[in-house]
Amino acid sequence: MIVGIDLGTTHTVAAFGAAASDEIELLKIPQLVARGVVEPRELLPSVLYAPLESEGLVDPFAPPPFVEGELARLRAAEIPGRGIVSAKSWLSHAGVDRNAPILPWGNDDENVDVPHLSPVDASARYLARVKASLDQAEIKTNDVVLTVPASFDESARELTLEAATRVGLKVRLLEEPQAAFYDVMRRIGDDGLARLLDATNGEARILVCDVGGGTTDLSLLKVSRAPELTIDRIAAGRHLLLGGDN
């Protein structure tokens, strides 16, 4: 079984499937969607929320004091000073110490009781939730691919690996635009790929534009078949923080 995880700026999602099969299934992740209401959903908002004491919210899946998932997304939008958002894009922000407890970002005199986490800490929590859901579904995690923006530098990639290692996931990194092109290849099949290469004299250059919740990722791929099919990323956008809320 192969597991793929997209640790997104706004949402985290995981999928799994047998290596010899085209069948892919999205992982359903149980989460609080309202007070006292738990639902399994395919999208896990990449948000942590520290409830007010008067709210009495307890997340059965998350270490206190934070609430995770859809309810966290809703409440953090209403009281931004109590929410941790966009941890992924902070991983690539060279202007801050990404292992320091800097999130929630900014000073907020009204929410001084909110614990602060580092971008790596927050990312590890989302991955821990995914791993717990995989374990609950009895899906083995010995072959896990974790996607990252092509624009991530080596530091951001190492920090992403650190977050995965903390929660017991041994992963291989794959650039997100390249993962998207692999999916296109799967959809068009061998015939579609052959037509593409025939039309480009055996070598195609593909520009992949990945517009996400916190990053806009551009990659130029070279696809050739001399003598066998190869895919090389020959250029990537330089802008790490194009888009998002920071």
Which stretches of residues belong to each language-model region?
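Phosphate-binding loop and its immediate beta->loop->alpha context
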Residues: 20-167
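Short, well-ordered amphipathic alpha-helices
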Residues: 127-132, 185-186, 219-222
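Short helix/loop capping segments that flank catalytic or ligand/cofactor-binding pockets
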Residues: 13-15, 57-60, 155-156, 182-183, ...
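Conserved nucleotide-binding/hydrolysis micro-motifs of P-loop NTPases
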Residues: 20-21, 54-55, 151-153, 178-180, ...
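Glycine-rich phosphate-binding loop plus the immediately following alpha-helix
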Residues: 40-53, 223-246
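Hydrophobic, small-residue-rich alpha-helical packing segments that form membrane-like cores
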Residues: 132-143, 150-154, 160-205, 211-212, ...
